[in-house]
Structure formats: structure tokens, C-alpha cells
């Protein structure tokens, strides 16, 4: 939350959850809007050598950054932490000690975060929707496909920021969320 827009707090329940269990983090926003940067599949050093500067520029004004896995090197998380608080989940290529799932609660909106490698076929929207319902969330953010999407799938919003480094479509991308009384998602193309 930027200066003058109110205050927010954070509480984490569950301590160190088993990797298959979801960590639960609660954010309280009192007045104003919370901006969230969302990124996934950065693959630092196994497929990419650096994160594009445009990512840092786009995330320079966010309150929180969500990384949906396949970080592959702690350096990415450390550099993102210089910009904002970071919540990250473990991807299938990660050897970092991260939870497999996170559930964030921002005011009355529950946001689930997974990598998405448990869904087959890759990125199947019906299976993602069912997983989100099982997690009890209003919004499910995943990665793994390296392909961005915003899909209002009946009673759950499905989001995927794509990849800013190794996309499986022509578009390198990240996402920004704006949360006040409702959540709005915007796909951000990354130019090099």
C-alpha cells in the first residue's frame, strides 16, 4: 500500500506447512487499493540468464509479488523482495524450500496460488476450476503452461501470468492485480 492510502497488515497461519498443504496468509486492507504483481516460470539460469528490466519497472509500484513457481534460483526471489513482499510456490523445476500451494486472503477475496504441474492436460481449465473449488478460493493463479490467460470460469477466476523469459507463445508476460472491493487482473506484455 503506498503512502497515504491506508494501512495493511499480514498474518500467516499454519507455520511451516507440509509441502502438499497450503500455507494461509491473510492481508487486511484498510482504505485504498492493493496492487499485486504476478509472475511465473522465470527459469533463471536453467533456461534464462536474467529477468527483463521491464519486470522490475512494472513491479516498482506493487505492494506484493506472487511467484507461481519454476523460480529455479533464489536470486530471483531476493531481487523481487527488494521491490515488495513476495509469496512464492514451488514449481516442478524448483529445488527451493517453498510450499506447493498458498492461499491468500485479501479482505474477503481468497486467492489460491499453485504452480499447476498437478493438472493434466497442462493448463486444463476445468481441472483448474475444480482444484480452485477444492481449495475454497475465489481466484486461482497458476503457472506451468508459460502461456497467459484470464478466464472467468463460472464461479472462479482463473489466472496465469505466462512467462517473462521463456513463453510458449509469442508473448512474454506478467500480470498485475488490483484489489479493493473486487479483484481486477491485467496482462502486461514484456518488451525486451
UniProtKB/Swiss-Prot annotation:
Keywords: Hydrolase, Metal-binding. Its EC number is 3.1.4.-. Binds 2 divalent metal ions per subunit. Its cofactor is a divalent metal cation. The keyword Hydrolase applies. A divalent metal cation 1 binds at residues 41, 43, 70, 146. The keyword Metal-binding applies. CDD domains: MPP_YfcE. One of its GO terms (molecular function) is hydrolase activity. Coiled coil: none annotated. A divalent metal cation 2 binds at residues 70, 92, 115, 144. Belongs to the metallophosphoesterase superfamily. YfcE family. PANTHER family: VACUOLAR SORTING PROTEIN VPS29. This is Probable metallophosphoesterase MJ0623. The lineage of its organism: Archaea, Methanobacteriati, Methanobacteriota, Methanomada group, Methanococci.
